[in-house]
Amino acid sequence: PNGEKLGTYGVIKGASSFIGATVADTEFGLEALGYEFENLILYATYIGLGTVWLAATFSRGSFASAMKISEDELFPAISPVGYPIGKKSLKESVMRKIMKSDQRKPWDKLFFNNNFSTPLTEKESGIYLAPLEMLRLAPSATNAQPWRILKVKDIIHFYVSHNSNTRDEEKLIKRVDLGIGISHFHQVALEHGLSGDFKKLSQENIQVPENTKYIISWVTKDK
């Protein structure tokens, strides 16, 4: 699609090529979209292309029309694709400062051990130190880092957290963000030879904080 006709995209100028993804409104649809789309973004970066996740700053109506997206499909994000100029512009530097894109929450705000009252230390994370650190550094809309992780023995539970006044549309984006984080976790786990499966497990014996929703778990496979 033509960049000028399809709106303004933050600090992206002259963008004419975009990738976008839609998904049905299913239980894990948005998380799966975030996971797969981030894998694509990581590959594009690997081969030298410049990309920018856009989840709230693009003209959905124009793109939905150009991509012939049906009304029952969710269309949460796109990315322009091109060759990066290199040096950040003053405008981009200011935006990154405002959005705190170069900052991340510390471990004790994101990762917990056995219960949500006990922070997980890097030492206690064991073989999952690198995957969890890469999850911590993953990008998210407005750098909100909505993921919360509970480690119980060899099981990693993934949750999405939001404020009590978060709008429904923002909650959908946070689910996409969790998928992005899970992509980082999984790719690094695989690189380190860790094997496991994603499963939905009972939360009956876990006291989950308010405004925090369980999504899925990573169950380590015995070698």
Predicted feature descriptions by range:
Residues 1-223:
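Acidic, surface-exposed loops and disordered segments
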